């Protein structure tokens, strides 16, 4: 009997892991497991790229305590690999092997595969507690693998939030010892999970510790035999977190929290989040939500929604009796506290604030330590799913239960199929860096650091191009003053910014540094720096060194500051292509620009917050434009003729695309299939002549929509 049970368990585990592997390869393909393939990291960018550079610069940094100190990254302040998002459980052992590893080594593909497999394994462990039927167990695992919050996070490639198996592991420990402590090592298991969760993702650490404390307090009341140990564990868990916190550099990084700017209310859980698919459902429409609440994405999926509905009907119809419900009370109280924290003190349904209540400033500061409060909806999601599965497997007719589970699983697959496959990972090739000039090779040999003005930015000339300079700095052993730690030492950053501005104004510049200036040039820098004629334009980037070794007379720079109105006037006789992206509000446009656009019949001044807009203006006239607050917009002009059929725009095909924040957050301007948009927040604009030649590619930013600089290579 026991041997048969063990064989059945092994088969269920094997089927679960195989199912996870199949889903993984369907979504990502095989190339992601190539440890030298970093192309998909650069294609994705964002948190995945940040985590990669945390690992890369750790390889270049000396060993230290606290562990994971990064010296060349975010220079001269530095950071820690854990704060940047690199998993110390993997990066610290791999650092020991670093001399044997190739320069482009990445472990993220295998880490994401592990997330799939562990999601399946702990899903099986939970299913095993409620049914011995192997088919029901594997079907239940399928639902855990098809959980939209898990798939959405893993689509982003961010290994921290993707490790949602940690929540399932916490559920497993809790429910395997639900009414009595069956494993004497349960405190050890909780401790290991807490430390591991902290190393992987601090949000999950907070969740696991809360469940561990709830478990201990519950059994202090209901299990007197273990009372003394359990009381001790309540004190032990916070001490473990504090020790891990210190050993991984969180106490040494000078972090200051942007509580007033990035309040935890912004990234909260919307009350409609469990039924709001955003743009990921094939069947249900997306519902409104407030800016930032994508962090609380917890859509159940239509299959799970039906599963939950049927479970409610079962509970009402059958009214089953549940034993030992008192042991569930600490678990439910913990979930309630998570829910209260997740929705924040500003409670919303859709884009409507239902009510809000005040919190003292110290409480807000504490809450902002884990400011993406919507993520605390994940345990609620899995509790809802597990509860529904519990009811389904309790149906006495197993055949009916299995048929219903299969049906719901197929509906779930159909509904969220867009989350199951990601072409970015299948199509990503090698890294194509914009740094092509031979001059960059000399920089790597002759300089020690790269200084960017303004520092700590992600867009120097084009959106997210900082990652190419980080890669360049890593491969050439240079320090660089950019990067994106998860938490920012704001005071130290401001001190460095002030020192940099002072050195630029006084002319006392570092002879071992190459200076890069963001385009458009910072307004203050434009005033105080007086050596623009000694700068060079290298691959479109504004470069300065104290000895001018890159200036051979062919790439010396000319800078022309322009307001928005001056730009429109300068290129009015040509064609101007516009695509909006991210948070642009028409209220920020200067009045003279609004007046000019309205005279042309443009709807741009009516663009709403985070809306979508594209427009074509040629020879002082509006040709075509599209604007929407509800979807993305696109204009295609094939051949030479505009949509009106009357006016020749250029001898090239033109494609314009804009997606507001809720619809993809993107701006694109393609001419003859080549991207020329900066992709930045604000108005991205390209001016072209009759032959389709690029006259200027600039943007007017969100914070200052009335100023830009045109940079030319003087002839």
Role assignments for model-derived ranges:
Residues 45, 240, 244-314:
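Periplasmic/ER-lumenal interhelical loops and adjacent helix-loop junctions
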Residues 416-559:
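Extracytoplasmic
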Residues 558-715:
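Short acidic-hydrophobic catalytic motif
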Residues 23-118, 147-148, 277-280:
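Membrane-interface coil-to-helix junctions
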Residues 2-4, 174, 206-239, 311-323:
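Perimembrane helix-loop-helix junctions
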Residues 1-34, 233-238, 316-334:
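Start-transfer (signal-anchor) and selected internal transmembrane alpha helices
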Residues 113, 117-126, 136-178, 183-219, ...:
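Membrane-embedded helix bundles of polyisoprenyl
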Residues 83-87, 106-116, 143-172, 199-204, ...:
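Membrane-interface micro-motifs in multi-pass membrane enzymes
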